A protein has these predicted regions:
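Auxiliary tRNA-acceptor-end handling modules of aminoacyl-tRNA synthetases
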Residues: 86-87, 91, 102-110, 116-138, ...
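Hydrophobic anchor at the beta1->P-loop junction of P-loop NTPases
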Residues: 353
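Walker A (P-loop) phosphate-binding loop of P-loop NTPases
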Residues: 358
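Conserved lysine of the Walker
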Residues: 361
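Hydrophobic positions on the alpha1 helix immediately C-terminal to the Walker A/P-loop
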Residues: 364, 368
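Short beta-strand-centered segment that lines the nucleotide-binding/catalytic pocket of NTP-utilizing
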Residues: 375-391
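Conserved nucleotide-sensing/catalytic segment adjacent to the nucleotide-binding pocket
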Residues: 394-435
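Conserved NTP phosphate-binding and transfer environment spanning the P-loop NTPase/kinase superfamily
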Residues: 468-617
Length: 617
């Protein structure tokens, strides 16, 4: 499979001549890097006239002047996280503010200068702040560097492992450091932030990086780098500390503002800024149910010797991934059986199943229904989607836009009334929502619960308390929150976000089942995420059970389906930079051709196809 990349043009001063460089490069089937370089020579005056537009200001960049300096000179920094730019976006590409658009030194032989291209047909530079997901990701990477560097300064032999996010906080595990002291560590982090030193990258060879990480007992990083196709790596350095991440960071450590560090078992909690008011620290909320389920996944990963991407790759290459699949699927079945036991022991008549997009809710509902049947129950699968009100009756919000994720798009009064009637043994006619027409229809779908009937109601708002009638017997309701809480890390300092896995799942599913393009899925994703933050995540701790729908093996399987789709995205597309980031991670993963081992009722089948729950024959 040919892997092709396009690098936008870079204007440089090459030996006294303005030089516009454009390059294409790709990997052939043997992963050999082939570069085609086109160099168009112009005089130096052309370079000088290349202007940038930064928030309405036209700037002629001076040689060797960074975007950071330009933004400073424009007076766009206030010292507040809410208003200060963190990174920049140019022609769909995200850049560090330390990026230098025009350099005076001889850069022609340096491939890195081509990769870091200054590409904008009109020169527009979009400044990205904390209110953007891109800005928050850059802040997170900056926080990681500051934390790990500070830990290294205090206790050089200590090991830190990125664990999981808990609301607006991050749990980091610390090992090999019996003397670890949270307060002392917090002071050191503040000291590093106050030093406000620049965060510059340096390009080194993969061998240099592997030698460094092996010498500093960071075998997790060295093992991962052995799967990297490129011969070089961009690292961040300070003194004798060296680390790398998968994206841009803030220009200096001083951008780490509005944070806190709290003690935690075997480590600490880093509390991020408030998303709605970044100039203050968010309130840390303990989530014991979520935390316990995540730790259970980590324990299983350790037992299966699959805690990192390098572990997964080795299992794929050895063929042992088949055993991993069998154990994962057996574990899921065991959990569904246990949940069915709990539902029946309580005497619940209604199961409410919620979770964020691409969590595998539909397959989970069907597999739970199968287990309930082994108890002699008659499960009835329903969807909250059928209780949507007509689209033309949805009122816009204060911003004038219609929020289709809002709970007010559901007829909660009708749902509450019909639920009460069903539990009283009455017959009701259930509505059917016609998504093509955007209207509710009544097609004679009547329902009455038998003594052995159990409703399984799936929907993003299923855990919202507004759904249920008052004074309802709590024992009649059983709540489940489903989410793929993947326990795999790239390495100790780089975790794989649950949202990343869900985006991979959704991209493949939307293409396979709906014919939706990568561009369309990625364009909708920010809106989906905002809806989840507002309407799903706040209620997850209300669940009686949190069900982890991830599997340790699925990244190796799903790569086969998503990789070709991502490579079709062109450089000029708005989502190109996001696709590059996704490809960057997938490049480390060894593809596994083991579909014949995946059961037809697997949650993974909901996304790659072949799930027999959806057969019509």
């Amino acid at each position: 499979m040919e892997e092709r990349f396009y690098q936008p043009p870079l204007m440089v001063d090459y030996r006294g001549k303005g030089c516009l460089m454009v390059s294409y490069f790709f990997f052939d089937s043997n992963h050999k890097r082939i570069v085609i370089l086109l160099s168009l020579m112009h005089n130096i005056e052309r370079m000088v006239l290349m202007n940038l537009i930064i928030e309405g200001h036209s700037i002629t960049p001076r040689p060797d002047t960074s975007l950071f300096t330009m933004v400073q000179e424009l007076g766009l920094f206030s010292g507040k996280l809410s208003s200060d730019p963190i990174v920049a976006k140019i022609a769909g590409r995200v850049f560090t503010l330390n990026y230098v658009p025009v350099r005076s030194k001889d850069l022609a032989p340096e491939r890195g200068s081509i990769r870091k291209a200054m590409a904008a047909s009109d020169g527009t530079v979009e400044l990205i702040r904390y209110d953007s997901p891109i800005g928050r990701d850059a802040y997170t990477r900056t926080a990681q560097f500051v934390m790990f560097y500070s830990l290294y300064r205090l206790w050089p032999r200590a090991k830190a492992q990125m664990a999981c996010t808990i609301g607006a906080s991050l749990y980091v595990k610390v090992t090999n450091c019996p003397e670890f002291d949270v307060e002392k560590f917090k002071e050191e982090v503040q000291k590093t932030a106050n030093e406000n030193f620049p965060l510059h990258r340096r390009r080194i060879t993969i061998q240099e990086a592997m030698d460094y990480y092996n010498a500093t007992a960071q075998e997790d990083k060295a093992r991962l780098l052995s799967y990297r196709k490129k011969r070089t790596l961009d690292v961040y350095e300070k003194d004798d500390f060296c680390d790398y991440f998968y994206g841009e960071m803030a220009p200096t450590t001083g951008f780490l503002r509005s944070w806190d560090i709290l003690p935690a078992e075997e480590g600490f909690i880093f509390v991020f800024p408030d998303m709605n008011n970044p100039d203050r620290v968010s309130t840390y909320k303990e989530m014991p149910n979520f935390f316990n389920v995540y730790n259970e996944g980590k324990r299983w990963g350790a037992l299966m010797e699959c805690e990192t991407i390098a572990d997964l790759n080795e299992l794929t290459e050895s063929g042992k991934i088949r055993e991993l699949i069998r154990v994962n699927e057996a574990l899921h079945e065991k959990r569904f059986s246990a949940v069915a036991d709990m539902v029946c022991e309580r005497g619940a008549r209604v199961v409410l199943l919620a979770g964020p997009s691409s969590s595998g809710k539909t397959t989970s509902a069907n597999r739970l229904a199968t287990q309930l049947r082994t108890h002699g129950k008659k499960p009835i699968l329903m969807s909250l989607d059928d209780y949507y009100i007509d689209r033309d009756k949805i009122l816009p919000g204060p911003d004038g836009k219609v929020d289709l994720e809002h709970i007010n798009t559901l007829d909660t009064a009708l749902f509450s009334e019909q639920l009460q009637q069903l539990l009283l043994g009455q017959e009701v006619e259930i509505p059917t929502f016609n998504f093509k027409k955007g209207k509710r229809e009544w097609i004679g779908h009547k329902m009455r619960l038998e003594d052995s009937s159990i409703i399984i109601m799936e929907g993003i708002h299923a855990l919202n308390p507004q759904l249920l009638p008052e004074n309802l017997d709590a024992n009649l309701i059983f709540r489940i929150y489903a989410s793929p809480l993947i326990p795999l890390n790239m390495d100790d300092h780089n975790r794989i976000n649950t949202s990343f896995l869900r985006l991979l799942r959704r991209t493949v599913r939307d293409f396979e089942s709906r014919g939706s393009s990568v561009e369309n899925t990625l364009d909708m994703w920010p809106s989906v995420r905002r809806g989840e933050e507002k309407w799903i995540f706040p209620y997850q701790e209300n669940a009686d059970v949190i069900f982890n729908t991830s599997t340790l093996y699925e990244l190796a399987v799903i790569k086969k389906f998503i990789y070709p789709l991502l490579l079709k995205v062109e450089p000029g597309d708005e989502c190109y930079d996001q696709v590059r980031s996704m490809v960057k991670v997938l490049n480390y993963i060894t593809e596994a051709d083991v579909e014949d081992e995946i059961p037809p009722t697997s949650i993974v089948r909901e996304f790659i196809g072949g799930n027999t729950f959806y057969r019509k024959d």
